[in-house]
Amino acid sequence: MAAKEVLFGNDARVKMLAGVNVLANAVKVTLGPKGRNVVLDKSFGAPLITKDGVSVAKEIELEDKFENMGAQMVKEVASKANDAAGDGTTTATVLAQAIVTEGLKAVAAGMNPMDLKRGIDKAVIAAVAELKNLSQECSDTKAIAQVGTISANSDESIGEIIATAMERVGKEGVITVEEGQALENELDVVEGMQFDRGYLSPYFINKPETGSVELESPFILLVDKKVSNIRELLPILEGLAKTGKPLLIVAEDVEGEALATLVVNNMRGIVKVAAVKAPGFGDRRKAMLQDIAILTGGTVIAEEIGLELEKATLEDLGTAKRVIITKDDTTIIDGNGEETQIKARVAQIKIQAEESTSDYDKEKLQERMAKLAGGVAVIKVGAATEVEMKEKKARVEDALHATRAAVEEGVVAGGGVALVRVASKIGEVEVLNEDQKHGVIIALRAMEAPLRQIATNAGEEGSVVANNVKNGTGNYGYNAGNDTYGDMLEMGILDPTKVTRSALQFASSIAGLMITTECMVADVKEDAADMGGMGGMGGMGGMGGMM
């Protein structure tokens, strides 16, 4: 086991804070409408230019192991915020840095770290409750477009195209983002169905850059049982090999010899194939397989209705224009089922939903209806160069996540104003001692940090702007885009409540852990000079003369 280096107390905290600052300072320059770009070096190809906080955070690794631990913990904040709400990563990083910086100062001054953490936690709980009170529903197209615009760095075209997509396929509809061929963004709405099952083996992946499987004009085999014996699939595979078309297998499971053979055939290019598990469980799985069959014009191979997999032919298979499979979900686009049958199936599900007494069943039936009747909207991102395309695509994806979050939990005033208002409205949070009270103050002070950073990035003095906003009421705030003050909602500067809430909760959670850190352990750094001595062994070549 390698020797370890151990740091205690203030030595550990100073190193950790240095790492936090390196990562946070790199990320926070991107915040706000006048945030700057960060250029990331890539081992091959052109460098990546981005304003996406989590993309910057993921690139940072520090040489000093103790500083790196601090940086990695803040990276976790950005990743968690991104996973939960798909946006707000920079806000979360700025909040975490502010809480850690103030918290470690208080610890150095002799305050109890555990009480500070409890105070911070109490303030955050109160703040989240107050955020819910401030939140307003985001239902109309205009509000959705404004949220998308803000998240896409004040690019109105992106906000509008997302709002249009949501209008076309419904708020529950499926919206995907692709790289387009034109200079402008385009919106395509395609009939399709998505379900939450990914590929059964990563060896099916044929688009390594996105980690997905894409099948063009595939046959779709639907089986209501586990498939483990490859003999059952041979007649279908032989028929397919003659057509040269790909195959998607949707079954209860595909395992053992069957899965291994499919993977080998796919890798050798004999048959293009991918397999996914059928969505749902029990009776719901049977119903969803039937939905897919009607959508694609296929038949579900089920022994209970006298159909055996070995006797299945190509006529029993469904077809679609395209299928996209990621590790988490499968999207069937443009199924070739009969329109009349699809409408009849939707009407049947609608009747079931109306008759159902269970809220859960009702929700699931409505979900199935949306998947059958709704479509898939594809936003094709247009740009002049590949570098710009990648940067723009990341912004569109961020904006899409933000609008979904806004529809889910509503919106609050943007530009860091909501957190400032929340901090001023939280009255006396109940605390047990002075250290906890200081923890509350740390959290409330940190809630001003995003506003200060937005102002700083816009070339203004953060403290002056924060003071002006604090003196206002309601949605009064600072519009960094055009350097004016006014009602943020009227100016169309909105943040999804979910994004702001997630950023605050994750930042305080990780910051609390860092404040209560007393010891850090890392491998001792091996001295490069010692390792270099091995080079002398090259002289051993002379031993050839001994023969």
Curated annotation (Swiss-Prot):
Residues that bind ATP: 30-33, 51, 87-91, 415, 495
Record-linked PROSITE patterns: CHAPERONINS_CPN60 (PS00296)
EC number: 5.6.1.7
One GO-annotated biological process of the protein: protein refolding
Entry GO CC: cytoplasm
Domain of life (superkingdom): Bacteria
Catalytic reactions of this protein: ATP + H2O + a folded polypeptide = ADP + phosphate + an unfolded polypeptide
Database matches in InterPro entries: Chaperonin_Cpn60_CS, Cpn60/GroEL, Cpn60/GroEL/TCP-1, GroEL-like_apical_dom_sf, GROEL-like_equatorial_sf, TCP-1-like_intermed_sf
First-listed, main subcellular location of the protein, grouped into a coarse class: cytoplasm
Assembly, per entry: Forms a cylinder of 14 subunits composed of two heptameric rings stacked back-to-back. Interacts with the co-chaperonin GroES.
Name listed for the protein in its UniProt record: Chaperonin GroEL
The species this protein was found in: Shewanella halifaxensis (strain HAW-EB4)
Gene coding for it: groEL
